[in-house]
A protein has these predicted regions:
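PP2C/PPM-type serine/threonine phosphatase catalytic domain
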Residues: 1-227
Length: 227
């Protein structure tokens, strides 16, 4: 995943597969363990990331690393020393995660809230606008994939975190872990009530017996709101 400055060490976790994963042919007989490692240091921030495909037929995850928006071609807001990092955990295919990895950071920076340095609202608007951008994209028109998304905007004074789904952002403070995001899982009573009120249901810890998270980018099969 993604680490800024001081990475934390965690015990490895087993993949949580369901019977439908195997019957639908979504799992390889052996995991792809080749790893992609990337590091970069800027004037203010540094990052390291590691990606591995694992058991899935395709690499369904994506990421974005922006050390400073000023360094992007055509940057619309200059001089604020703002960075952006995102991790996008795909499911049901890779297209939604790849689209989000390519575009979400630009979508966020193009919001009026970002230009006004209201970064909390910029993340909210950016996530919603990314959904709309996927719907408008011709090549995504028949795609049913989705992704959990967690992203941070880093300024010289603060870190702003937004997420949808169950990918978690954790900050290391002198070796201690502090969660910056909140997992949207079906067994959370508040989230479960919201899903049921929208006409869905939760069965075996999954939305409509299928999806293991309650919010995300894409997954339009599960989104009834016409807006």
């Amino acid at each position: 995943r993604l680490a800024l400055r001081s990475p934390l060490k965690f015990a490895p976790q087993k993949e949580n597969f369901t019977s439908s994963d195997f019957t639908m042919g979504q799992i390889l007989s052996q995991p792809v363990t080749e790893k992609h490692l990337e590091t970069e240091t800027g004037s203010r921030l540094a990052y390291g990331l590691l990606c591995m495909q694992g058991w899935r037929i395709n690499m369904e995850d994506a990421h974005a690393t922006i050390l400073d928006y000023d360094d992007l071609p055509g940057a619309s807001v200059l001089g604020n020393k703002v960075g952006f990092f995102g991790v996008y955990d795909g499911h049901g295919g890779e297209k939604a995660a790849i689209f989000t990895g390519k575009h979400l950071h630009n979508i966020v920076s193009n919001t009026a809230a970002f230009k006004a340095q209201d970064y909390v609202q910029a993340l909210k608007d950016g996530f919603l606008n990314c959904d709309q951008a996927i719907l408008r994209d011709y090549e995504m028109r028949d795609d049913d994939s989705g992704c959990a998304a967690t992203a941070v905007i880093i300024t010289p004074k603060a870190i702003f975190c937004g997420n949808a789904g169950d990918s978690r952002t954790i900050m290391s403070i002198n070796g201690y872990a502090k969660a910056l995001s909140y997992d949207h899982k079906p067994l959370n009573e508040g989230e479960k009530t919201r899903i049921c009120s929208a006409g869905g249901y939760v069965d075996m810890g999954r939305v409509n017996g299928n999806l293991a998270l309650l919010r995300g980018i894409g997954d339009f099969e599960f989104k009834r709101n016409p807006d």
